[in-house]
Swiss-Prot record:
Gene Ontology biological process terms, A to Z: ATP synthesis coupled electron transport
Highest taxon of source: Eukaryota
One Pfam family per UniProt: COX2
GO molecular function: copper ion binding; cytochrome-c oxidase activity
Protein source organism: Zea mays
Mitochondrial intermembrane side: 1-43, 106-260
The protein, known as: Cytochrome c oxidase subunit 2
Length: 260
């Protein structure tokens, strides 16, 4: 029984993108947006290491050469033009190298697709999500709509993740441009999926847009990232990326179920 639990747990994490215990790094990127965030983090971390090494070297050198035993009579240095120019220009160059990719990524994340293949609307409630697929309805029909609640711990099946599983997943096709419209029906929420690099605030009376391009099939887990009341921690988000054929079959089945 223990081996079965471990095996199921291993394959669940291997095939899904979710937070793990004692995780220190990022989840694997599934969108160009998230890959850009990870790359920017690595670039900035490189400069942080350079600055840390330089500051430590200067500190150790000062302690070694300018202590009381080495220099009983302290030197009186009140001005140094060269060093002042260096410590003014060098940080400015570093900030420039950080700012250019940062602004490029920021504006690419803020861009909204003019003609996306699929539009999905996420509506936050206390404490669940409602999703609307409005691309498949005619003028006299309702859109494909369903609610997504967290599965209670007592109802979890073997291998499902605690506090992260939902009864109805958001199913999307992989390698397809999506547009997410996020809003709220009551208080502030935030629709966030780390592997997709998405965190979009759900504000009552306002529609916020974000674009997503999932590059690989898989199951991606997220949660509401805005404190919204007592059960804020029980608003998970699950996005399942499938092939275009499987997505079309899922939409057809959902429309049939909704009609019946």
């Amino acid at each position: 029984m223990i081996l079965r639990l471990l095996e199921c747990r291993f394959f669940t994490i291997a095939l899904c993108d979710a937070a793990e215990p004692w995780q220190l790094g990022f989840q694997d990127a599934a969108t160009p947006m998230m890959q850009g965030i990870i790359d920017l983090h690595h670039d900035i971390f490189f400069f942080l290491i350079l600055i840390l090494v330089f500051v430590l070297w200067m500190l150790v050198r000062a302690l070694w050469h300018f202590n009381e035993q080495t220099n009983p009579i302290p030197q009186r240095i009140v001005h140094g033009t060269t060093i002042e120019i260096i410590w003014t220009i060098f940080p400015s160059v570093i900030l420039l190298f950080i700012a250019i990719p940062s602004f490029a990524l920021l504006y690419s994340m803020d861009g909204v697709l003019v003609d996306p293949a699929i539009t999905i609307k996420a509506i936050g409630h206390q404490w669940y999500w409602t999703y609307e697929y409005s691309d498949y309805n005619s003028s006299d029909e309702q859109s494909l709509t369903f609610d997504s609640y967290m599965i209670p711990e007592d109802d979890l099946e073997l291998g499902q993740l605690r506090l992260l599983e939902v009864d109805n997943r958001v199913v999307v096709p992989a390698k397809t441009h999506l547009r997410m419209i996020v809003t709220s029906a009551d208080v502030l929420h935030s629709w966030a999926v780390p592997s997709l690099g998405v965190k979009c605030d759900a504000v009552p009376g306002r529609l916020n847009l974000t674009s997503i391009l999932v590059q690989r099939e898989g199951v991606y887990y997220g949660q509401c990232s805005e404190i919204c009341g007592t059960n804020h921690a029980f608003m998970p988000i699950v996005v399942e990326a499938v092939t275009l054929k499987d997505y079309a079959d899922w939409v057809s089945n959902q429309l049939i179920l909704q009609t019946n």
